[in-house]
């Protein structure tokens, strides 16, 4: 195939189909929409969840669960996340916010034992699980309530 042997496609030359422009166009009168009914009208759309008048699935199934409002204010930190910041000796809520480890809206933090900590740190004003407390104290750290 060469550039000089290329020709326009038959479909390229064909003009755009203009519906509802007289009987002679082939798409006159109803314009491909059929006769009457909701789908023939302008703006006549049926939502995806419509089941033909039958009670829809989202109303047949019972409600369950809820979104807790407390979730916005509580967070948990793992021990290995604290171990990543080697220059921190003293840890409290405001310091965790400064180093972007928690969101600014968080008011309560709990430290959980996931991983190990190998250096002494001082934790104040944060709740700590039993396992995390043992791990911190065995590394030479202190947990203040």
Swiss-Prot record:
One of its GO terms (cellular component) is cytosolic large ribosomal subunit. Residues 32-47 have a biased composition (Basic residues). InterPro entries: Ribosomal_uL15 (IPR030878), Ribosomal_uL15/eL18 (IPR021131), Ribosomal_uL15/eL18_sf (IPR036227), Ribosomal_uL15_bac-type (IPR005749). GO terms for biological process: translation. Pfam families: Ribosomal_L27A. Residues 23-51 are annotated as: Disordered. Part of the 50S ribosomal subunit. This is Large ribosomal subunit protein uL15. It comes from Buchnera aphidicola subsp. Cinara cedri (strain Cc). The gene is rplO.
């Amino acid at each position: 195939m060469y550039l000089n042997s290329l020709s326009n496609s038959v479909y390229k030359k064909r003009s755009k189909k203009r519906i509802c422009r007289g009987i002679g166009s082939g798409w006159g009168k109803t314009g491909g929409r059929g006769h009457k009914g909701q789908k023939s009208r302008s703006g006549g759309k049926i939502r995806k969840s419509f089941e033909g008048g039958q009670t829809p699935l989202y109303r047949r199934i019972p409600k369950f669960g809820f979104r807790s409002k407390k979730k916005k204010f509580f967070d948990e930190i793992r021990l290995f996340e604290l171990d990543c910041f080697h220059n921190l000796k003293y840890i409290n809520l405001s310091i965790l916010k400064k180093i972007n480890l928690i969101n600014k809206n968080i008011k309560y933090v709990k430290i959980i034992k996931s991983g190990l900590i190998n250096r002494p740190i001082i934790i104040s004003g944060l709740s700590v699980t039993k396992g995390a407390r043992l791990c911190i104290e065995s590394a030479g750290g202190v947990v203040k309530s």
